[in-house]
Amino acid sequence: MKILFHFTITLFVLSLVACNQIKSPEPVKQYAFIGGKEGDKIDTTCFDSLQLSDPFILADEETQMYYLVGSGGSLWKSTNLKMWTGPYQYITVDTTSWIGTAPRIWAPELHKYKDKYYCFVTFTNPKIIVDTVPNRYNVQRRATHILTSDKVAGPYHPISDKNYLPEGWSTLDGSFWEEDGVPYMVFCHEWMQTVNGIINYIQLAPDLSESM
């Protein structure tokens, strides 16, 4: 009887240990288009009829076209810089990440680097507060992220889940810079958090997947 009792207790303890060692499954990533307006009619219009903040134009030699992006997350195409066709959605993200399903999309830039295309874009999730400046501002989660695509018109997706900058910093307006074969991201540490805004830079990995 004692042997059976000890054997039962041993099995029970081993079961508890095994249960504690089983890791909870990681949430399933859910990639989706964000920005722009799904279902928008694709049309061609003259440049002076477009309403867009923080515009950026990439002249792509491979397709012999110009690509215009700006805050809001839409893309337009043109062959002559006068007439533009769009808007197209081109940004996809994991909506289970901190970015969420409806982030603010600011100041995107498209760059070609080593035969791939990259989108430097600032996301803001107003539901996440990372800092508080007394009598001034509740600092929302805001950061520049780098997305990539094999095609200039996308879809673009995050290179990795890694943060390029501390998540407690409110950063924006990231831009690409290369010097002596070394890639960098130039960015702004926002004045709403620092009082005096700071323009800074970080060195990037050769594939732009993380900061060095």
What are these model-predicted stretches?
Residues 19-212:
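Carbohydrate-active catalytic/glycan-binding domains of CAZyme proteins
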Residues 1-28:
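Bacterial Sec-dependent N-terminal signal peptides
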